Amino acid sequence: MSKSLDISTTEAEQTVTEVIDTIVATTPDVRRAVADYRGQSNSVNPTGDDQLAADLRADELFEQRVLGIDGVASYASEERADVKTTDGRLHVAMDPLDGSSNLEPNSGMGTIFGIYSEQPPTVGTNLLAAGFVIYGPITSMVVARDGSVREYILEDGDKRVVDDDVTVPEDPTVFGFGGGVDSWTDEFESYAEAVRHELKLRYGGAMVADINQVLTYGGIFSYPALESRPEGKLRVQFEGHPMAYILESAGGRSSDGDQSLLEIEPDELHERTPLYLGNDDLIDRLEANID
């Protein structure tokens, strides 16, 4: 059963701040784990993806430290089947190491998180804050909270603001579409063909990096419904909700092809969804094209 937010706004805000600061403080250890735990773990996550040792180590680090915060009642992760609970008030859902398949070629990876007022699985409108970390040439963090989005540079477990008002640029420049082209539906392929002639391809295999391209340059990111997988690939709770919260807070839109991703109330913790995120007009056209 979900635990409701039964605390004052001040207490909730303090806990949200503690969660964000704890994630910031953990990032140096996650970067070390990426270097030290590059091998396979011979296990799979609840949705069948192969897990690297780095996936498990990042999950372990965040679980220990986030659940150590007095105000946190539960921790849910893409890497574990069930929610881990304790006494507290707010609820954290994470993709501890997004894009870990990029580890072998040493490409972009990151961490995605959402802070909820209700225990997952829950609707996206229960988010109080969401964000992601990119472990790139520099470590950066984007956080959506209280209707605005900020970008930080992370150094030695601390953060400094580099942009206190991140907004999606009005003139879109880039696009990135996941899933095998041969598996795209005819409707989505028609839309994608039009977009290819308007925008530049930017797709790196890590959602954090691809979404940051949209935040930086404007455009659209999608992992669509496929003929072979109409339910989509990405997880509502761990990827869809947090990224939708960020994009919508930055003036963009999110959609599952019909409604805002934030309106989805998953029945299962690891439920998947088609996912479309970007500039308003591009999402409007997408919905009209696949309707």
UniProtKB/Swiss-Prot annotation:
Signal peptide: none annotated. Its cofactor is Mg(2+). Mg(2+) 2 binds at residues 95, 98, 239. Binds 2 magnesium ions per subunit. GO terms for molecular function: fructose 1,6-bisphosphate 1-phosphatase activity; magnesium ion binding. Its main location: cytoplasm. Pfam families: FBPase (PF00316), FBPase_C (PF18913). Pathway: Carbohydrate biosynthesis; gluconeogenesis. GO terms for biological process: fructose 1,6-bisphosphate metabolic process; fructose 6-phosphate metabolic process; fructose metabolic process; gluconeogenesis; sucrose biosynthetic process. Gene3D superfamilies: 3.40.190.80, Fructose-1,6-Bisphosphatase, subunit A, domain 1 (3.30.540.10). Its EC number is 3.1.3.11. Homotetramer. This is Fructose-1,6-bisphosphatase class 1 1. It comes from Haloarcula marismortui (strain ATCC 43049 / DSM 3752 / JCM 8966 / VKM B-1809) (Halobacterium marismortui). The gene is fbp1.
